[in-house]
Amino acid sequence: MSVVPVADVLQGRVAVDSEVTVRGWVRTRRDSKAGISFLAVYDGSCFDPVQAVINNSLPNYNEDVLRLTTGCSVIVTGKVVASPGQGQQFEIQASKVEVAGWVEDPDTYPMAAKRHSIEYLREVAHLRPRTNLIGAVARVRHTLAQALHRFFNEQGFFWVSTPLITASDTEGAGEMFRVSTLDLENLPRNDQGKVDFDKDFFGKESFLTVSGQLNGETYACALSKIYTFGPTFRAENSNTSRHLAEFWMLEPEVAFANLNDIAGLAEAMLKYVFKAVLEERADDMKFFAERVDKDAVSRLERFIEADFAQVDYTDAVTILENCGRKFENPVYWGVDLSSEHERYLAEEHFKAPVVVKNYPKDIKAFYMRLNEDGKTVAAMDVLAPGIGEIIGGSQREERLDVLDERMLEMGLNKEDYWWYRDLRRYGTVPHSGFGLGFERLIAYVTGVQNVRDVIPFPRTPRNASF
């Protein structure tokens, strides 16, 4: 007899009358007056638990089975049969039930069988994957990550691992976590009285990365098409539903590509992964549509069918100025569009995903290619109905003299970026890329409102538990 995941039993991949073993945790136990107990056993392989039907003739029925409570771990062996009851097609007629682990005090078990607030679940993040919600989020997160890897592999991209420790500030915003082994009680000082980072582990001031982009560009200028996918860090003191101090970013980079090329790539990628999650995680998506956001499934279906709208930033500002809507944040040329502006464009004006292109240079990063007008850069944001910006990207500045001028304007020391500038000195090429915040993508797919609930252990200001 074989050990099988619960998903194989429920989805008909195990023949009826087969003897199987499933291993998992008790969701609920129900006892009938006829001396039969019904255990709902889950193992995380799918959304639903499998029902194990246990007769009181089992030797350990009174001693073990009747003591089982939510959270106990069990190994159930029995025959797969068609279920006469509603709610499941198959169940297991148990011939053996082993208890692998008890819940010490069922009355104080934090995940007892009742609904908990999302805020409470954050306080017990080590146990919250046992809930329907966080378990479903975890499976969707996995499926989206696998679909992204699959998409880029099929498109001929190479996955590049970029460093988490860096001396470069990709965004130029300075909101970075410092990495140091210096003794905080006895910091070395230089002649100016400043901290002497020459004495530090790396011999210079070092940080956790805010982006793998700059390193990714070096490989794109050798392998043509690459992507990075990993954790990034922002020391931004923001307590909002959209911000994390540690989050995952996907960043493709393509040599010989312009802004339109990567806008097309972004559209194809999003539609590919949305289709994958609807097909591969239908059970979890059904749960999200029923319990979290009634539009969870239909929103993705509409997205897949939609043609992306495209609009210049300047035209987008004109649309917003003339729409008759009073926004909380004022609209004028040169302002960075806020979430309410983005959502108006996607949800009300275009009623479709929108690519906004050619932003003012003063609100964008130093590496974005300066347009011929000298005022805007070849940058883009993909705006999705229901969330606003989901992707940000640009054509990169491949001209060394223009790049140096932009660095000077932004107060950056070009010598700190000597290796990045070398790409423009040795066989420079036009190249482009974008960044996708993975947690924001998961929030969009699931309808979960706060990104703290779509990453296993959220890191936010004054919170690094677990």
Curated annotation (Swiss-Prot):
UniProtKB keywords: Aminoacyl-tRNA synthetase, ATP-binding, Cytoplasm, Ligase, Nucleotide-binding, Protein biosynthesis
EC number annotated for this UniProt entry: 6.1.1.22
Name listed for the protein in its UniProt record: Asparagine--tRNA ligase
PROSITE patterns: AA_TRNA_LIGASE_II
Outcome after substituting P231L: In temperature-sensitive mutant HO202
Gene Ontology molecular function, alphabetical: asparagine-tRNA ligase activity; ATP binding; nucleic acid binding; protein homodimerization activity
GO biological process, one term: tRNA aminoacylation for protein translation
Family as reported in the entry's similarity comment: Belongs to the class-II aminoacyl-tRNA synthetase family.
Gene that produces this protein: asnS
